[in-house]
Amino acid sequence: MGTNGGRPTKLSLVPLPKGSVLLPGATLRIPVSNRPDLANLLSSLLDRTNAIRRDANSITFGCVPLCSPYLSKDGQHVIDNGTVDEDKKEEFESLEAGQARKEDLYRYGTLGKVIGVQRRAYSEPHLLVQGVQRLTVRRVLRERPFFEAECILHDEKETPLNDRETAELFQQLRQLSRELLTLLRYTSLIPNTGGPRLSPLIARKFELIITKSDLAQAGRLADVMADIAESGLEDKLRVLAAFDVKTRLERVVDILNKQNQIIRGSVKFTTISTDNIPPASVLDISQIDPRIRDLLSRRGIPGASGTPPPGLGGRNNEADEKESNELDELQQRLKDAQLSPEAQKVADKEMRRLRKMMPVNQEYGVIRTYLENLADIPWTKVTEDKLGPETLKAARKQLDDDHYGLEKIKKRLLEYLAVLRLKQSTNQGLEQQISILTKELDNSGGDIEKDIPSLPESDRAAIESKLNALTSKRTVDKSPILLLVGPPGTGKTSLARSVATALGRKFHRISLGGVRDEAEIRGHRRTYVAAMPGVIVNGLKKVGVANPVFLLDEIDKIGGPNFQGDPSAAMLEVLDPEQNHTFVDHYINIPIDLSKVLFIATANSLDTIPAPLLDRMETIQLSGYTTVEKRHIAKRHLLPKQIRANGLSDGQVVLSDDVIDKTTTSYTRESGVRNLERELGSICRYKAVQFADATDSAKLESYNPVVTVDDLEEILGIERFDEEIAEKHGRPGVVTGLVAYSTGGQGSILFIEVADMPGSGRVQLTGKLGDVLKESVEVALTWVKAHSFELGLTSDPNEDIMKNRSLHVHCPSGAIPKDGPSAGLAHTIGLISLFSGKAVPPKLAMTGEVSLRGRVMPVGGIKEKLIGALRAGVTTVLLPHQNRKDVKDVPEEVSNGLEIIYVKHIWEAIRHIWPDAHWPGQHHMDFVESRL
């Protein structure tokens, strides 16, 4: 049927497939299969048509889309406030065009003209329909066997040529249309983009439509572009309902904007553009298949080779303008960073290269990343050290609050602070004098207007000489490089953080454990793909200042020489105070000043640290915590921390010193306090359960916060380590020695038992003894055999005390390995006690190495041994005379609770052990020597 420009007309209607919309000027393929209504409609239309005019082009009917539940009743507005009925959603999802009812039809449609039938191989036939003009469905007359309705056909309204807003919308539509076509063409060249594609022939056809369209045809162009763009059903229905040209232009412009943004989001774009690409659209040519790109380049397509097209200059669109602004920002960042002269020279050179380079160039990203790294390095920015009269006092308090003991490291750090403060005071005085002399030198030329005469040349030279002398006296702060060596869990890492807090500086931790590649320290050279600076430069970038505190954790576990280089050798320059002011990272390749960085390294052992690296660091030994120190640490730090961590409050868990000591000695054996903290956590959790039960049962008064020693077995289980206790009665051949555990921090007593039996002089050693300990038994036996006559053990100087006798030396706790020379004195006294039949006092313990001449030589672990002796009930201790200095480190309560006797020779020890006994050779003590 024909059009009537607004008068009601009876039309046959075809419901379009779900999601399809036919716009005027567009073409739509309607599947014929499973559409009985369409077959009945075509049959009826053909019967009505005269035989002479019977062809496909004469068949017209109304094409009405299915209505979306997301549109308002008038079809003009999208419902996006969440009020859409769920039943309507489900009904729409399951709706098919062949079973549509009149309620399912949209209010507006398009008069369609059949232009042909299409059928491809192995596919169902389709009816090709072209949109002619818009229509409004006024009233449905019947639904079966096909729809018929009373409709109003609408002619295209004239575009207001003098409306400025409409003209601007039309220009925007043309620009966005060109952009969409260009993006579709280029995305067709890129594999696996998943986006819409457009053949060159069809794209060329649409380009001609865009070019030839003028303002009078704005509505027609809007319909064409709305059909091309991939948009939602609701958007296209709103375009169909837009009879006003201006409204239609606004809606189509929104659709094109969304479509272009979606394509840009799926493909990486750069500043490459061509004459056919509008300024807002750019594409990364490198994404196109190389063979296609080469073909495009040979055919002369601009921009396909990766270079900007002639006349564009690469700086004529929004992306380029944004890129230019970013480069200006980078230039400002480099300026604000106050680079060193050498770094500034390199940065200026690279920035000039960058500005001349297209972003598509592979070097562009490399250079830009390099410059960004240069800008991030703190070349001159430092944390101001606020060193005043209260600095040392505040730093000492900070260190004491965070850590108990560790006096050596605290002393060294306070020394560094004091030196830093004195240097700062000296420099301030020099700066004042330099300022005065500089001012005098500036005024030495005189002032004619003020009638000030100039200084003689000799006076000027004197001022310059004095100024140079003062300048040379400026002190430069070179931070020390400290190495904290000690067992695990002794607070080395946390101490470094506490140092940073005390100094008021930023802190950064670098874990060197397991580092095998030299490039991790010094960075990769820029020639490598994805090269970046090493951990030192990255640390500076992270803290943002040139004088932080760097913790080099586990430096003893850094890798040695391998095919990737030597990481430990790379640390030589970093940790050398004479070289690290010109440290060169392979990536930056410019000297960086590390002299202001306070390096604190930690290690568990010195054995694996290369000698050249160890020589560059100031080593501070940290021994394990003693039981007394662990008690203080537990009371001040660990217990309050665990109480809070387990949801309790202060006072809800109370542990006495005896409970803490029992937990330390019977449930842990370590140098640090990590396991002690775990055990205290178990106690707190046990009390937390009791407190929760009391609270839930409203019997809070029954809760007892005190933990006793008897409760520990129920809370922590059976004791894991047995503590040796001094015996009450002495017996010949049994001596109490002293031992310091290899884990560090703890000591105890060790019984040495010697027994004899008939035999051939053989000596049997048991108790899992090490080689050094076995040798000390041999030395002790040799000395006793050599001096048996002086000791009154034999009646004849030539008699062998071991004749017809064998010995067995045993150290209890046979499962625990034992080694070291410190039991030499105890072995000697044990042999003398056995052979003489005199018992050693049970409350007396001893330690010391013995030489063949009978000298008692110094040993280690004195502090731990004395604490263990006091805890075991020992009252008197024999120590080597040369260990007198080590007793100064012993806590006062320990030294006051023990009688410490220093001996130089075995004869001295014998005299103190058995003061009432008479030894035949005692008068020879000062000059007796070996008979060997």
Swiss-Prot record:
Motif Microbody targeting signal, chain ranges = 930-932
Active-site residues (renumbered) = 822, 865
Question: Is Cell wall biogenesis/degradation given among the entry's keywords?
Answer: no
Query: Per its UniProt entry, what is the enzyme's top EC class, as one word?
Result: hydrolase
Quote the Gene3D superfamilies the UniProt record gives: 1.10.8.60, 1.20.5.5270, 1.20.58.1480, 3.30.230.10, LON domain-like, P-loop containing nucleotide triphosphate hydrolases
Segments forming domain Lon proteolytic = 729-916
GO CC terms for this protein?
A: peroxisomal matrix
Q: So where does ATP get bound?
A: 486-493
Where does it localize? Peroxisome matrix
**GO MF assignments:** ATP binding; ATP hydrolysis activity; ATP-dependent peptidase activity; serine-type endopeptidase activity
Q: Give start and end of each Lon N-terminal domain.
A: 11-260
Q: Where is the composition biased (Basic and acidic residues)?
A: 317-328
Decide whether keyword DNA-binding is in the record.
Answer: no
Q: Where is this region: Disordered?
A: 298-328
Q: EC annotation?
A: 3.4.21.53
Q: Which GO terms describe its biological process?
A: protein import into peroxisome matrix; protein processing; protein quality control for misfolded or incompletely synthesized proteins; protein targeting to peroxisome
Give the CDD domains listed for this entry: RecA-like_Lon (cd19500)
**Belongs to which family?**
Belongs to the peptidase S16 family.
Protein role: ATP-dependent serine protease that mediates the selective degradation of misfolded and unassembled polypeptides in the peroxisomal matrix. Necessary for type 2 peroxisome targeting signal (PTS2)-containing protein processing and facilitates peroxisome matrix protein import.
Q: What is this protein called?
A: Lon protease homolog 2, peroxisomal
The lineage is: Eukaryota, Fungi, Dikarya, Ascomycota, Pezizomycotina
